[in-house]
């Protein structure tokens, strides 16, 4: 069953003209992570590189392509967690960084802290030799259009949010049985300056534990934080539920308790995986035993050989 990597490209409503690109993006990310695992790379390597690839893809709400805050600026959050040691690293409200997930990994590996935020994260990035990029390089025309649309007096905030909840994430188990997760996001459209969501919060925006499994979620950050969604999924798995059952229970609780929609990708320590969501759509892909699994709508489960490129 090992190794395995599962990725998501965000939950919500994906406009028709972007569905194919979103699916291609998650498939490529899963292939990238799986290739690392096949070469004997670690689960941490796999999830970080899979997520970094999606951060560079302007079709996702992470890195380049991130949504804009109320001032029209990009502020990003990211998390990495190593299930072997329970070490984690995160950055929040970080600016002008092309790959926040890689900076989060540096926080995990080079500091005694779990999370650095805003200017402190920027100073740390500079000390690590991580280059700053011009903010304009992270802003797409699509993000600008959504920002302007949401500023209009008659804007439907629910419609605008559901159209771009595209947090990206990955979970993996490597050949040694070690588990990891990574999540990255630009956050909510037109959020207040300095708003931080679930993504960089351990137990909310991700969790990994070799004894149980790993989760990376997507959806409405405030709802995910209220129910500590990632740890809730793993709690159900500790009680003997499968990854799929645990995901469905946790997502149903979030909907019932705080009216929150979202999705998760999950693995357990045996390599059993799930990609489940309560939102309209979630682009996801998984690679295991030479097969690439992927989908977008409820009920989707397509497969093709991992090495087959579209």
Curated annotation (Swiss-Prot):
Pfam families: Asparaginase_2. Coiled coil: none annotated. One of its GO terms (molecular function) is beta-aspartyl-peptidase activity. It catalyses: L-asparagine + H2O = L-aspartate + NH4(+); Cleavage of a beta-linked Asp residue from the N-terminus of a polypeptide. Cleaved into an alpha and beta chain by autocatalysis; this activates the enzyme. The N-terminal residue of the beta subunit is responsible for the nucleophile hydrolase activity. Has both L-asparaginase and beta-aspartyl peptidase activity. Does not have aspartylglucosaminidase activity and is inactive toward GlcNAc-L-Asn. Likewise, has no activity toward glutamine. This is Isoaspartyl peptidase/L-asparaginase. The gene is asrgl1.
């Amino acid at each position: 069953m090992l190794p395995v990597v599962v990725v998501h490209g965000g939950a919500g409503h994906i406009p028709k003209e972007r569905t194919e690109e979103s699916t291609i993006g998650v498939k490529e990310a899963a292939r990238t992570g799986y290739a690392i695992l096949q070469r004997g790379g670690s689960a941490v390597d796999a999830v970080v590189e899979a997520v970094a690839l999606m951060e560079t893809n302007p079709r996702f709400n992470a890195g380049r392509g991130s949504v804009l805050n109320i001032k029209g600026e990009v502020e990003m959050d990211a998390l990495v967690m190593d299930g072997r040691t329970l070490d984690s690293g995160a950055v929040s409200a970080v600016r002008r960084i092309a790959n926040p997930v890689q900076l989060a990994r540096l926080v995990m590996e080079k500091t005694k802290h779990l999370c650095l935020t805003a200017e402190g994260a920027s100073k740390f990035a500079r000390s690590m030799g991580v280059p700053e990029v011009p903010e304009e390089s992270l802003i797409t025309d699509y993000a600008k259009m959504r920002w302007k649309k949401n500023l209009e007096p008659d804007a439907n905030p629910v419609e605008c949010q559901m159209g771009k909840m595209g947090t990206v994430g990955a979970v993996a188990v490597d050949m040694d049985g070690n588990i990891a997760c990574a999540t990255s996001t630009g956050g909510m459209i037109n959020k207040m300056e300095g708003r931080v969501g679930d993504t960089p919060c351990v137990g909310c925006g991700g969790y990994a534990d070799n004894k149980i499994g790993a989760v990376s979620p997507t959806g409405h950050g405030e709802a995910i934080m209220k129910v500590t969604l990632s740890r809730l999924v793993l709690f159900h798995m500790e009680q003997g539920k499968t990854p799929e059952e645990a995901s469905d229970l946790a997502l149903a609780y979030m909907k019932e308790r705080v009216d929150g929609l979202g999705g998760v990708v999950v693995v357990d320590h045996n390599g059993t995986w799930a990609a489940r969501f309560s939102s309209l759509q979630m682009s996801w892909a998984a690679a295991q035993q030479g097969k690439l699994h992927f989908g977008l709508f409820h009920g989707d489960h397509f497969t093709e050989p991992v090495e087959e490129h579209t």
